[in-house]
């Protein structure tokens, strides 16, 4: 199959070479202008928070923003330092690709992307696409996810320096500095710490009392910089943190059962992208290197119920891609190829060094004619693992996966449909980890079918989608001889049937502006693994039937008030669907008041936030209580 990658690469080179020699007949050459964004998308369902609407939300991380999207479930393992992952339409977090400026954020070890560590302070937009976004020039990796989240860095529109200080509940202290040069460069640095010792209510058959969350602290600093020049962009990022890992609330509230596990993270990446367009041809290249280091400590001297564990993990990731497209007035042809090298080293007992080579190639055609638009794509994936112990290496994996999208657009109305079949390979943890690995795992497949209608004019946007998902050979962890030994297995079939609705409105009258958006999802996820199992047709854990959100944003002469409401219905914590494992519905209301003062050429911005205004005591994940009402105040001075 290597010949396929060679043909794609050769096609890309031929296209770019031809474009460099093509004449510009009857075309006036103008200076280069950098444009961020894509043309209107009609083919796939999408949701976006951008600009002022994004900054006015009472949110600090990407995970906080995504929870307001239709069909999204955020798994939050409690506490301000807990892991936060995203799940779209119950496909699983490892089927969701997260892209920063068009380049994927990866984790070769377990596939889980912790969205809590990515700040919104320098983001222009956060967008969610079912299937993938409708852009002419995409890398092969962008087609390799069932759903995609795009984080677009904000390009600086002025030369300025700003400093920010914030304080809040549970010992929160935040210091931030931002330096920008118009259209060229920004540097963003942040330090934050919090004790995370919030109160919670604990109820069981034998007690009903109020406790205080322990080991939920986090201290981190982050520094990143991005540069822009014509079609070239570069981004560097470094993140360092120490955090407590708040365990589940079990047995009685005593120090003996409090989790004392600690985790240290060091994350670094540098990436670049270059894009150039000629008359009918366009070319894009991406390059990225990432280094991740993690230490996990479990110390029985601080918790007698645990065993000693002090493990270190190091991951490296090197990625390169090239994409080329030919465009006419009604047809666009794209060819792209990607290559990713990932390795994992650890001091876990009897774990061998392993690295993975992942190559992808894509052929795509998009046609438009009198309001009709269609996209056909074929993705080829080849994955090979290599280990110092050859017996542990799995056989190479090669697959073709298709995608079909179609839409009809007339004035403000759009009718669209898509089908996409994709798979995810088992992670290195799934295959090779000493206690849980299973080298015989098969890839996990998802098939998506979607039919939707969309209406959009200057002020109003309405969308309605009905969808059906099918997940085969789902990779799950099950206990073996004892609770301390688990194994990864392929298990069963999951079917999902859902309906999602979104509505948005925005208007400006002089100095007054108003915007509102609402999302609602009704989704049923059931297990169809075996008719002989007692769990047959049971509801999948953590998949509520109903979920909804509303955001209202008002602005007047430098003042802005944003309120957001989030609702999640009842759901089960286990596949057995026992009443004891039923988690109740919950809802929260957040408020954010902001005022900007102009002082000569400078500005002062004061912000007051209240999260969980109604003091809702709830659990997103069973036995991981979430914070109640909490406050935050921030002051920012911009020079």
Where are these regions (language model features)?
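Periplasmic-side early beta-strands and strand-to-turn transitions of outer-membrane beta-barrels
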Residues: 134, 150, 158, 178-262
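Conserved C-terminal beta-signal and adjacent last beta-strands/turns
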Residues: 179-180, 217, 221-229, 365-367, ...
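Extracytoplasmic beta-strand/coil segments of soluble accessory domains associated
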Residues: 63, 67-107
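Face-selective signature of the C-terminal outer-membrane beta-barrel domain
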Residues: 187, 224-243, 263-394, 398-409, ...
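Gram-negative outer-membrane beta-barrel transporters
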Residues: 327-334, 368-373, 467-470, 489-575, ...
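A beta-strand signature from Gram-negative outer-membrane beta-barrel systems
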Residues: 120-160
